Amino acid sequence: MIEIYYFSGTGNSLHVARQLAKRLPEAELIPIARFGRREAITSTADAVGLVVPIHALGLPWPVKRFLERASFKPGSYKFAVTTRECFQTVFTTMDKLLPRGERFHACFAFEMPVTYVPVFEVYSEDERARVEREMLDHVDRIATIVSRRAVHRPKDHPGWFVLSHMIYPLVRRWFQLVRFPNMERSFYANDSCTGCGTCAQVCLANKIVMRGGRPAWQPNVRCAYCLACFHYCPSHAIQISGRNTTRRGRYHHPSVSAADIAAQKRRA
């Protein structure tokens, strides 16, 4: 039995997890967002995988919290897939969140279409098609390695040592203390909002609630920074103040619906 845990705001990681599960017949997909804040998480599977995005060069905080509280079968085969290139320090961080003596046997990172619109523009249709083709090749290779329970731990390029061990921690800390908190207070819905409630449905942190037919971001609930609300809004009404998002495109994986994203929060 293989359990694949995933976290996905705009569908990239869910799509990759689905493709991987197709190639691993014994695989079961389990959403990380399903688990409550204080819920104990126990797995008895012989193999466990994670398919997750990268936020601010590192793990999304819900994924980190999941690993801190999860209890996997001792000696089980563990693998991780990130849907964005990252430093190998991300995977060593994941190792440290496991019980002493445990580590991820195989780790993989590759690019899916970018979704962090405060910095990047969304990919063109041609770019998305290219990335999709490359993703399928990556998943074929990953499935082969996982099926064999092989060890696969790539190393950073030697020239990246300073970036990964000195610059990365500083940038990550800045995002945590400054960039994300400021952005969290900057979400709003413009006059294009129809009050459909999609944003609240896909919000993986349950931060968004509908009040008087308009979305409201609860200040006492921590944002997951998944941008599902932004990318799935059918009227493109969700904006981020000061981030020039009125001119940015929207993207979610075409095979993943808003209902699929919202379903991650559904309890088993």
Residue map of PLM features:
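FMN-binding flavodoxin-like domain, especially the glycine-rich phosphate-binding loop
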Residues: 2-4, 10-15, 22-34, 43-52, ...
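Amphipathic alpha-helical segments
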Residues: 20-21, 227
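Short beta-edge strand/loop motif at the mouth of beta-sheet-based domains
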Residues: 37-39
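Short low-complexity, flexible loop/linker segments enriched in glycine and/or proline
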Residues: 121-122, 223-225, 254-258
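A mid-sequence, solvent-exposed acidic-amphipathic segment
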Residues: 162-201
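Iron-sulfur cluster-binding cysteine motifs and their immediate structural context
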Residues: 188-189, 194, 198-218, 222, ...
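Long, positively charged, glycine-interspersed low-complexity recognition regions
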Residues: 236-268
